[in-house]
Amino acid sequence: VLRILTDSSRFRFRSVGVELEPERHRVQGLREYALLRTNVANVIDDGETSPEYSPFAWIDFSEYDSWEAVNKWAAELYSGLGMDSEKVVALARKLRRQSSSDADYITRALFFVQNEIRYLGLELGENSHRPREPREVLNKRYGDCKDKSLLLATLLRQQGIRAWPALVSTNSRYGVERGLPSPGAFDHVITMVEFKGKSYWLDGTRLYQAGGLDDLGFSDYGFALVVGHGNASLQRMYPEPPLASRVDITEEIIASDFNEPVILKVKTEYHRNAAEVQRFQFQNMSLESIKRNFLEYYGRFYSDISAVGVPAYKDDIRRNRFTVSETYRIDNYWKQKDSLIYNKIYNLSYLETLKKPQVRQRTTPYYLGAPRKITSVLHLRYPRNVILKLDENPVSIENPTLRYVYQDQYSDGVYTHTSSLSLKQKDVALGDMRSYLDSLDEIRKDWEYTLTVANPDVVPGYSELLDLKARLKVLSGGYHE
């Protein structure tokens, strides 16, 4: 049972996920809206869904008849605040002197707001929606998302750069358009910047950001209401799913002898959101703790692995690239049986990205996370040249959700496996679930497999055969089996 009393003649009502119409009555000069539902069926939540999807029915009500009306309400709260403040003007001049270009000015202003203005929300009374004056925020050196957004927009406007506060929903995201227009649809404020024909969505509350405008990490909140912008309705932040992260992994397994341990070297380069995650981790955890976590992860696959030193890292803040280098020793890597030597190859780069949902027979799309790309190159350096028979043709597995490509190659004692994964969208649509699961089964075959070669010390004539192949390769100008 739900009962609403209001004196507003503009009250609007909407039900989502269920056909429902309230009873309307007059009660002591007020309008009454009454809802009653009986024998409501149980709802089972699939889980693992993106924020805008919900299996539950809900109702929405508002006194606003359009998003333009909400924008007008917000514009009145944000207008006329602090453009000519002496402190704001002085700060803008300082940033301008430090900047090599307008693009550099934008990121310097952003990093100032992020790192020099402490995040603190005192959302009481009118300050639950009205931002504080930029000069007040500069004086006190703290502010919430509204305060930071307006300060950043004000600093950018001082440089003649078009910028506006933008209301977004971190909870509903793309689902905000399903509800009625209302200020209550939003719970966060960021800054929209129009620069050189592109729209940038900057968040003054984020930390650990670095790089230029096109290197920054970001969150796709789906739709935004840009306060005071010429387009006063909801705007889709990114018309096409943007690539939120990229991770490039290079692994090298170095063997000195088939009877000796191998050295595993791993170099991982993180971009955009992924770089910010690593920057946070390495600034807030000890290297020993990170080393222990990494070692526990690899220990799930290599039982005789030990770390050689602690992970090393390089933070390229100019390009927002964070590189981590690790070194391990693996004992008992090679297995021998009769005249054969074999070893396991683990392609671990994608384990945390591609998973099967806990509920396969779903009623809602399966959420994978923001679109991203991962590349992996693995080199296995044998202790001597071997004969390794491979299918060296590239293999591509693709469906509406993802694209996975891999290839095997061997040359001069080095086995190389290259692979890449592109997540094209954040959700697996219901109609694509079967193809996603089938593709994942096929892809997982590339994550663990065995390489087998003849033991050069046991097989008669093996070394002579390798010498002959090498001479033929030279004579043929690069013959390669």
Kindly label every feature range from the protein language model.
Residues V1-E481:
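A sensor for short, sequence-defined functional sites
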